[in-house]
Amino acid sequence: MSNVTVVSHPLVQHKLTKMRDKTTSTKTFRALMRETATLICYEVTRDLPMDEVQIETPVAPTKAYEIAGKKLVFAPILRTGLGMCEGMLDLVPSARVAHIGLYRDHETLEAVEYYFKAPEDIAGRLVIVVDPMLATGHSAIAAIARLKHYGVTNLRFVCLLAAQAGVDALREAHPDVPIWTAAIDQTLNDHGYIVPGLGDAGDRTFGTR
């Protein structure tokens, strides 16, 4: 799968294991999500374009390099994407943030949009869509379709954990959008949850169950 990257760094895998553990507290789970998102963001942004610039250090003039172009946009899918977005902003604090509110209909498992807010010039920016879980793929597909409707062409999708079915669905719907994840699990249960997964990422992040 040439457009799917599994981030196998030992720190990412260690933190994901702790998140999978059902005995991990809400406080620890939230911190681990933020830390893991920062590490994955490092991989996602490793090919950002650079400009050569001239600066002066306290010792001498020198050439150096800065990220080129407009500031990128993180687009967390509410609500759980917010936990990952914080970790990414730790690494790229100047990034803009778009918010995409989606919930999953528990009868149909389809994504239903209830909120959308993005920078006015989002079409000209790299947009990284963020959602901890890629299960059925419906939310990711809907979020990316919404962004494309606004003219966004440079898109990436980042999650902590994916199901193979979700990866396949997203690749079929948006073959131009590369995917980064810490792991791919093979199955979904009848409720659309990833197995073995890590449970409901939203409830575990916000302590709502």
From Swiss-Prot:
Keyword Ligase, does the record have it? no
Top enzyme class, one word, equals: transferase
* NCBIfam families given in the database record: PRK00129.1, upp
Pathway given for this chain reads: Pyrimidine metabolism; UMP biosynthesis via salvage pathway; UMP from uracil: step 1/1
Q: Which gene encodes it?
A: upp
Q: Please list the cofactors this protein needs.
A: Mg(2+)
What function does this protein fulfil? Catalyzes the conversion of uracil and 5-phospho-alpha-D-ribose 1-diphosphate (PRPP) to UMP and diphosphate.
Protein's name according to its UniProt entry: Uracil phosphoribosyltransferase
Matching entries from HAMAP family are given as: Upp_B
Source organism per entry reads: Caulobacter vibrioides (strain NA1000 / CB15N)
One Pfam family here: UPRTase
